[in-house]
């Protein structure tokens, strides 16, 4: 019995050396990029071209713990309808953890699994309860990788029936009851064994291939590194018009933008994504075609516009005027109405003030002339009244003056007064213009 167990163990070790879990591209396969997509883009000249190149696996998430966020776990499912349960798991920077108490010291994983790539599960003594499909699951959270391998375990009572074979989908292992069983899971890719360093692991570059030029002679346009470094190549007329987002590695969007397309920009553009640590090498190809910009044909020149046959016809404004649309915006509230009403009232008030000013100025001018006339008339009137009073006074004093005539005149003044008393009153001068002005001013 012991001899058969040793023979079975040696067979399992031989199977371990031959059964290797397939992984991502490595070695020479990693050097070549896999073509992900190829499309034709046709745009008009003068527009902006956007060549989409996106990949969530290229998002820069620096692993500060240097454990690469890797984990391996083994699961067991008893049959098609049974529920899968977790048996054991182990992180690259931690210890292995067994979930069921009965499986402790029975299920073993190699402590150096993340160094030598051997993630096989050893069961020391199998029993009937261990039958089922075992799944080896590898998860790389940093590189967004998930890989799995299934092994089916069958338990037999006859040690001579112990064997291992391939059923077309997975490995089948037949083990005698109480004998050890080794479920093989090997993956020696550097992404799981940490054989490569992290520096310069992410790089993106854009190439431009002119029509008729082979792929290996394409011109480099841009180089983008996860560290933030950027390098621009290509002809000057194109270098100033191409750009990629500054946060490309934070969003995983490396789309190329070309401003103001020209006919000389036609060609084959390729986006190359390389994540050397995670083994990502992808290529996306775009066939860019630049067409003539769409424009309206010029209208005929009218006969009376004076244009000759050699000059280009000018567009007729009446042709497009019939198809124009005039948008009239009517305010929904009464603010606009009150605003216009305020303008009208303010204008009317200014006009009234101006009219009042003119009337007052005219009245003031006329009142000044009337006062001047009144002053002159007053002086003349005063003189007339004095003369009348003086004449009346002289009449009253006539008897006395008659007596004085007989007397001897003392001086010339008395003589003149006497002559005036005996002489008739002078005619009163009447100024009709002054009288008319007095009546008008009243």
From Swiss-Prot:
Widely expressed (at protein level). Highly expressed in brain where it localizes to the glia limitans, which is formed by the endfeet of astrocytes surrounding capillaries, and beneath the pia mater (at protein level). In lung, detected in epithelial cells of the bronchus (at protein level). Expressed in intercalated disks in the heart (at protein level). Detected in pancreatic alpha-cells in the islet of Langerhans (at protein level). In kidney, found in the brush border of the proximal convoluted tubule (at protein level). One of its GO terms (biological process) is cell adhesion. Residues 1-19 form the signal peptide. Pfam families: V-set (PF07686). It is found in: Cell membrane; Cell junction, Tight junction; Cytoplasm; Cell projection, Cilium membrane. The keyword Transmembrane helix applies. It is a single-pass type I membrane protein. It comes from the Eukaryota. SUPFAM superfamilies: Immunoglobulin. Keywords: Cell adhesion, Cell junction, Cell membrane, Cell projection, Cytoplasm, Disulfide bond, Glycoprotein, Immunoglobulin domain, Membrane, Nucleus, Phosphoprotein, Repeat, Signal, Tight junction, Transmembrane, Transmembrane helix. Residues 20-340 are extracellular. Residues 25-156, 159-291 form the Ig-like V-type domain. Disulfide bonds join 53-136, 185-271. Induction: Disruption of the blood-brain barrier by cold injury results in a drastic reduction in expression. Up-regulated in primary chondrocytes in response to BMP2 and PTHLH/PTHrP. GO terms for cellular component: bicellular tight junction; cell surface; ciliary membrane; cytoplasm; nucleus. Homodimer in cis. Does not appear to form trans-homodimers. Interacts with ITGB3; the interaction inhibits ITGAV:ITGB3 heterodimer formation. PANTHER family: MATRIX REMODELING-ASSOCIATED PROTEIN 8. Transmembrane protein which can modulate activity of various signaling pathways, probably via binding to integrin ITGAV:ITGB3. Mediates heterophilic cell-cell interactions in vitro. Inhibits osteoclastogenesis downstream of TNFSF11/RANKL and CSF1, where it may function by attenuating signaling via integrin ITGB3 and MAP kinase p38. Plays a role in cartilage formation where it promotes proliferation and maturation of growth plate chondrocytes. Stimulates formation of primary cilia in chondrocytes. This is Matrix remodeling-associated protein 8.
